[in-house]
Structure formats: structure tokens, C-alpha cells
């Protein structure tokens, strides 16, 4: 082996030794007791998340210290807390975590007992804790329809507002056909079988749901004037008219919601 090669090899060994010593020193430094997490500060506009619920979800599960904690894993851990929609986590020197939480806002109850957020996400939480939002509408249908259900709910609610009708049930079939149950806004405590059922069918380019609802809203006062009472069912699946019934027929979502 040439002298130059031996010199390069010796320099490499020296460099590796220095790196090894440095890494060992850094490891010993990072393991000092003063870097063990001693405090977790939680912030956010929180109405449901409590210190107890956070502690119950995280006890014995936080791993690492200021240097070794994996922030992505920790963030996902906080997002398992009931009502938490999103979390951000950052370190605060030398022994703290600052966690900012965003809560779900409940829009309704899905037929399987989970809550539907206003962003169309299904999540597990105690439905009784959602009472601060008032009586929640019940949604039924394939889980893949959740995002569309939330978005459409706001659109359709705004359309029915001039009639002072409030949506209490939304049913989406496997074929994506829509049915709604509505009650007068001052009778939101009505029994599940009461109110007006509106069959809208599928959302089609040539006859969108919003257009069909507009037809119902325009015709509703005329229907009441003609039959002398509020109808219990309106079938708006037709392109050129509405079918009105005064005989009630159960909706799929009238089945008991599973806990």
C-alpha cells in the first residue's frame, strides 16, 4: 500500500473515531434528566376536550424526551383523543411540549352511532356531548357519502330556510338517491315519524338536486293552498312535476340509531 493511501486510511480512522466520540457525547448529553418532558401545554378553542380526556388517552404512551420524541407519532397520538380533529406539536426548550388542538364540530349523527363533523368526517365521541349544538340530524347511507352529505346538508338547509323547514334526517341510498325529512323550525322536537319527507333521487347533471329542491320550495305554498294542509311526502324525482302525498311512509333512517 502506498504512503498516500495509508495516510488517507489513517485520516479516515481518526475522523471516524472523532465522530464516534462526538456521537457518544451527544447521546449522553441528550439523556440528561433535565431534558425529560415535565410539562405538556395544550391550547385551542376547546369545548369538549378536557385535561382528563387527554390524560386518559395518553397515559403511558408518550415516548422520548426533548431530543428523542418523534413529533409525528406524538401528533397522531393526540389525534386519538375523542373530539380532536387535528393536532400540531412542537418542542419548547428544554422540557416542554406545546400542543395545539382543533376540535371536530358535530353536524349530525350517522346511523352507526358515530358523529358526522361539519367537514364530513366520521368520528367516535359521546353523542350526548354534542347537545350544545342542539338536536342533531340523523344521516344514513354508505360511509363514502359522508363528505358529500355534510356539504349538501348546508346547501339544502339554506334552500329550505325560506319555508322555515329544518332538515332532521338525510338518507342516501347505495345508488346515491337522496331523501330528506324536514320539520318546521319551531318543532325540531317532533317525533321521528313526523314532518315532511322529500324524495329527491340521484343528483344528475340534467336535473341537479338543488334545482329539484328549488321546485319543491316554489311549489310548497301552492300545494298547501290546494290540499288545505301540509303534505307529508313530496316526490321530486320527476323532471316535469311533483307527486304529493298526505299518507306517511317510513324512511330508512327511522330505524333506531345503533349506540
Model-derived features with residue positions:
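Charged, solvent-exposed interaction patches on well-folded alpha/beta domains
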Residues: 1-39, 49-65, 69-76, 87-88, ...
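Extended, alpha-helix-rich binding/interface surfaces that flank or overlap catalytic cores
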Residues: 42
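Acidic-histidine catalytic/liganding microenvironments
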Residues: 81
Amino acid at each position: 500500500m502506498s504512503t498516500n493511501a495509508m495516510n488517507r486510511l489513517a485520516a479516515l480512522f481518526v475522523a471516524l473515531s472523532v465522530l464516534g466520540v462526538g456521537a457518544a457525547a451527544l447521546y449522553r448529553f441528550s439523556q440528561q434528566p433535565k431534558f425529560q418532558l415535565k410539562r405538556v401545554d395544550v391550547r385551542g378553542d376547546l369545548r369538549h376536550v378536557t385535561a382528563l380526556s387527554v390524560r386518559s388517552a395518553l397515559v403511558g404512551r408518550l415516548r422520548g424526551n426533548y431530543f428523542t420524541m418523534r413529533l409525528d407519532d406524538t401528533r397522531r397520538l393526540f389525534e386519538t383523543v375523542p373530539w380532536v380533529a387535528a393536532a400540531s406539536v412542537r418542542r419548547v426548550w428544554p422540557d416542554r411540549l406545546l400542543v395545539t388542538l382543533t376540535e371536530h364540530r358535530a353536524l349530525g349523527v350517522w346511523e352507526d352511532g358515530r358523529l358526522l363533523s361539519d367537514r364530513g368526517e366520521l368520528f367516535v365521541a359521546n353523542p350526548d356531548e354534542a347537545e350544545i349544538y342542539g338536536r342533531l340530524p340523523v344521516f344514513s347511507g354508505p360511509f363514502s357519502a359522508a363528505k358529500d352529505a355534510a356539504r349538501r346538508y348546508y346547501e339544502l338547509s339554506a334552500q329550505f330556510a325560506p319555508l322555515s323547514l329544518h332538515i332532521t334526517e338525510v338518507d342516501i341510498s347505495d345508488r346515491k338517491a337522496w331523501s330528506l325529512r324536514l320539520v318546521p323550525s319551531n318543532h325540531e322536537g317532533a317525533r321521528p315519524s313526523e314532518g315532511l319527507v322529500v324524495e329527491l333521487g340521484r343528483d344528475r347533471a340534467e336535473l341537479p338536486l338543488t334545482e329539484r329542491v328549488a321546485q319543491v320550495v316554489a311549489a310548497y305554498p301552492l300545494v298547501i293552498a290546494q290540499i288545505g294542509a301540509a303534505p307529508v311526502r313530496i316526490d321530486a324525482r320527476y323532471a316535469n312535476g311533483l307527486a304529493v302525498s298526505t299518507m306517511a311512509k317510513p324512511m330508512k333512517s327511522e330505524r333506531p340509531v345503533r349506540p
